[in-house]
């Protein structure tokens, strides 16, 4: 089953009752259209459910692939799409042999990460982040934006409130009304930030440092340097300006660990913001004590699609249909990405200011980067 989904409001891909998940929604609707029994709708293992890539809470997919056992009829896809909510679409269902496993047959995966341009603004002089890299940082016009914001905060908040907001010992929740008001004001100010070509180039240079085989133990949880399972191979990274105000990062890798991409993007953002040399990234592949890297928001991450080159070669040799979307389906997927996924990412930023919260989090970073 080839499918795409907007992950906003879902607790990830994998079936995990009582939480709302993509697999849970698919199972329910498969039963509703008569493709599986009621008993099997409550137990994914009975249907041999396996995804080519698992996506976490809030993460989207332009294309993912599920291997599963169902009763397939001519109208199954049409009935499923009629029953499913608009944020989940089935692109097609293709018969495969009984031994096919979507996860093990997948050679590699393409991911995208969308970030607003303002996330690359330099740190304010008063921030902990600026103090940590003060010797490397040269003024690039960002401080003018922060000076404007400072004047706005003095007119909006009392001295006591500003102290509470700036005190790193007070870990105010993002849901705190004071923080929400502060970040809402910050969002309006940062929207006027103009990204320079040199800042975008610096971010891309940092992202290119990931290409190759490296030990990504600092980019996930529960891994130590030297653990073979922390070795990952990144095939390609492409950075471009996707739409006005947004940057698209495309990453092609064999496989990824929990939070790996979000931390890869976060570290490259920090390097570009603070004007650190791109090869600072290499320090995080090295042996030694674990280094802290914040996680960029899940809302910007989407699975572009799994790749089945090896398996498709076998299918071609047997004169079978390959596992890949045709041109018409690809057009539908691209429209879905724009209308459902990109719209949801932009809407969440407008409503919840997730990337503004992340800018504030980075500004308060006390951990040395060098």
From Swiss-Prot:
Predominantly, its location class is: mitochondrion
Among SUPFAM superfamilies, the record links this protein to: Pseudouridine synthase
In its keyword annotation, does this UniProt entry include Flavoprotein? no
This entry's Enzyme Commission designation comes to 5.4.99.44
The entry's localization annotation reads: Mitochondrion
UniProt catalytic activity: uridine(27/28) in mitochondrial tRNA = pseudouridine(27/28) in mitochondrial tRNA
MF terms (GO), sorted A to Z: mitochondrial tRNA pseudouridine(27/28) synthase activity; pseudouridine synthase activity; RNA binding
Does the keyword Nucleotide-binding feature in the UniProt annotation? Answer: no
Q: Which residues form the active site?
A: 56 (nucleophile)
Q: Quote the cellular component terms of the Gene Ontology held in the record.
A: mitochondrion; nucleus
- Uppermost EC category: isomerase
- Which residues are recorded as binding substrate? 111
The alphabetized UniProt keywords are: Isomerase, Mitochondrion, tRNA processing
Q: Which residues form the signal peptide?
A: none
GO BP, sorted A to Z: mRNA pseudouridine synthesis; tRNA pseudouridine synthesis
Lineage, top-rank taxon, reads Eukaryota
Matching NCBIfam families: hisT_truA
Protein family membership: Belongs to the tRNA pseudouridine synthase TruA family.
What is the protein's known function? Mitochondrial-specific pseudouridine synthase catalyzing the formation of pseudouridine at positions 27 and 28 in the anticodon stem and loop of mitochondrial transfer RNAs.
Q: What is this protein called?
A: tRNA pseudouridine(27/28) synthase
């Amino acid at each position: 089953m080839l499918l795409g989904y907007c992950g906003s409001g879902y607790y990830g891909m994998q079936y995990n009752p009582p939480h709302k998940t993509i697999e849970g929604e698919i199972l329910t609707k498969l039963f509703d259209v008569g493709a599986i029994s009621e008993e099997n709708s409550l137990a994914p293992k009975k249907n041999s459910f396996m995804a080519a890539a698992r996506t976490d809470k809030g993460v989207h997919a332009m294309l993912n692939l599920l291997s599963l056992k169902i009763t397939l009829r001519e109208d199954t896809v049409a009935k499923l799409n009629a029953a499913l909510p608009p944020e989940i679409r089935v692109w097609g269902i293709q018969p495969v042999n009984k031994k096919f496993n979507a996860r093990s047959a997948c050679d590699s995966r393409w991911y995208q990460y969308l970030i607003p341009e303002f996330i690359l603004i330099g740190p304010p002089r008063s921030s902990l982040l600026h103090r940590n890299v003060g010797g490397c940082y040269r003024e690039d016009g960002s401080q003018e934006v922060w000076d404007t914001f400072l004047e706005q905060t003095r007119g909006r908040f009392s001295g006591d409130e500003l102290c509470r907001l700036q005190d790193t010992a007070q870990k105010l929740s993002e849901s705190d009304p004071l923080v929400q008001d502060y970040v809402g004001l910050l969002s309006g100010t940062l929207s006027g930030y103009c990204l320079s070509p040199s800042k975008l180039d610096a971010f891309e240079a940092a992202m290119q440092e990931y290409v190759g085989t490296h030990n990504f133990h600092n980019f996930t949880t529960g891994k130590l340097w030297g653990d073979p399972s922390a070795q990952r191979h990144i095939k390609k990274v492409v950075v471009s300006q996707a739409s006005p105000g947004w940057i698209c990062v495309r990453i092609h890798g064999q496989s990824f660990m929990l939070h790996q991409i979000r931390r890869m993007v976060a570290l490259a953002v920090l390097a570009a913001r603070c004007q650190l040399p791109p090869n600072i990234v290499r320090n995080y592949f090295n042996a030694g004590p674990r280094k802290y890297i914040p996680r960029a928001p899940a809302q910007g991450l989407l699975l572009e699609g799994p790749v089945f080159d090896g398996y498709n070669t076998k299918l071609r040799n047997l004169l079978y249909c390959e596992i890949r979307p045709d041109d018409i389906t690809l057009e539908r997927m691209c429209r879905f990405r724009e209308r459902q996924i990109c719209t949801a990412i932009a809407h969440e930023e407008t409503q919840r200011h997730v990337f503004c919260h992340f800018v504030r989090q980075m500004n308060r970073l006390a951990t040395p980067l060098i």
